Amino acid sequence: MKRTNIYLDEEQTASLDKLAAQEGVSRAELIRLLLNRALTTAGDDLASDLQAINDSFGTLRHLDPPVRRSGGREQHLAQVWRATS
C-alpha cells in the first residue's frame, strides 16, 4: 500500500466521516472502498449509456417528424462539398 495525501474541504470531510461511521470503517478505508468501486465500474458507464439509448427507441413515436425545407443548410453543405472536392 502507498501513502497518498489529498486535500478535502470541510463538507467533504464531514460527509466522509458521517458515511464512515455509518459503515463502521475508518475514513481512509471508506475512501479506498469508494475508489475501488469507481475504478472497477468505470467501464460500466458506457454499457449503461448504450442501454439507456436502446431503451429510449420508440418513446417518441407519437410525435410527427419535423418538415424539412430547403434553405441555408443545403446551400452551406453544397459550398463545403465544392470547396473540398
UniProtKB/Swiss-Prot annotation:
SUPFAM superfamilies assigned:
Ribbon-helix-helix (SSF47598)
What Pfam families is this protein classified in? Answer: RHH_1
GO aspect biological process, one term: regulation of DNA-templated transcription
Domain of life of the source: Bacteria
Q: InterPro entries, per this entry?
A: Arc_rbn_hlx_hlx, CopG, Ribbon_hlx_hlx
The entry's cellular-component GO terms read: plasma membrane
- Keywords for the protein's UniProt record, in alphabetical order: Toxin-antitoxin system
UniProt region (Disordered), positions on chain = 64-85
Listed Basic and acidic residues bias regions: 64-76
**Protein task:** Putative antitoxin component of a possible type II toxin-antitoxin (TA) system. The cognate toxin is VapC10.
Name the chain's protein: Putative antitoxin VapB10
